[in-house]
Regions:
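Conserved phosphate-binding loops in N-terminal lobes of ATP-dependent enzymes
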Residues: 200
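Compositionally biased terminal segments of proteins
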Residues: 1-188
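Short, intrinsically disordered C-terminal tails of secreted or membrane-associated proteins
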Residues: 211-213
């Protein structure tokens, strides 16, 4: 199968529409998250990066498969990337706590909390979507070496923070990446126990699986 190299707004809205119909908790991140905050598309996007309630992820994967998507990177329960001729989706399961916060499993004992208060509304082609706040989208990029598209997005986030597109963005030299992208994904052997639990869990049981592993 030939996979798309970009993910257009129409495909993003199709996926967000499915999530909305399921009344599930989600959060758009990455470049599409930034453009949703800006209110217009400012560049092409390779994928849709999205946090999703872990209990809905199996149904989402099944639905995406029905539309021709197939896994290209499967690190569940941490993340799964799927691709098709329509686009690419990078799904990050998160356990939703009673207060609305989402908790995502990382490698080894790492867990990441995505606060409910860090979600806000943006728009893609005029359609409302749930995205991370500008501050949160900036925080989510702190652990990576910035690529050219990241520099573009960070500039937009700086201008949003400063209240207008005419403001000068923060210098790239002041942002110190914590880890390279590859360094963030070196401990793949530690997925074995989590993957076994994840695969054994029935539909709707993935959240319990993550909690069992200390989330």
């Amino acid at each position: 199968m030939v996979h798309a190299s970009t993910t257009p707004a129409s495909e993003v809205l199709t996926i967000i529409g499915w999530l909305t119909e399921k009344e599930t908790v989600y959060q758009v991140n990455g470049g599409w998250g930034v453009d949703a905050l800006v209110g217009r598309q400012t560049r092409e996007h390779g994928d849709l990066d999205v946090f999703v309630d872990a209990d809905v992820v199996p149904d989402l994967i099944e639905w995406l498969a029905s539309r021709g998507y197939e896994p290209v990177t499967d690190w569940l329960p941490i993340r799964i990337e799927l691709a098709s001729e329509h686009g690419r989706v990078d799904v990050h399961p998160m356990v939703i706590r009673p207060n609305g916060d989402g908790v995502q499993q990382g490698f080894e004992d790492a867990v990441f909390t995505h606060p409910a208060v860090a979600r806000t509304r943006g728009s893609i082609d005029g359609v409302p979507v749930i995205v991370g706040t500008a501050e949160r989208l900036r925080e989510l990029r702190n652990g990576y070496d910035p690529r050219p598209e990241d520099e573009h997005d960070l500039e937009l986030l700086s201008r949003l923070r400063d209240g207008g597109a005419d403001q000068q963005p923060e210098s790239a030299s002041t942002r110190k990446p914590v880890l390279s992208r590859m360094e963030c994904y070196t401990n793949l052997d530690n997925l074995a126990g989590l993957r076994g639990c994840w695969n054994a869990a029935g539909a709707g049981g993935r959240g319990r699986c993550l909690r069992r592993h200390g989330v």
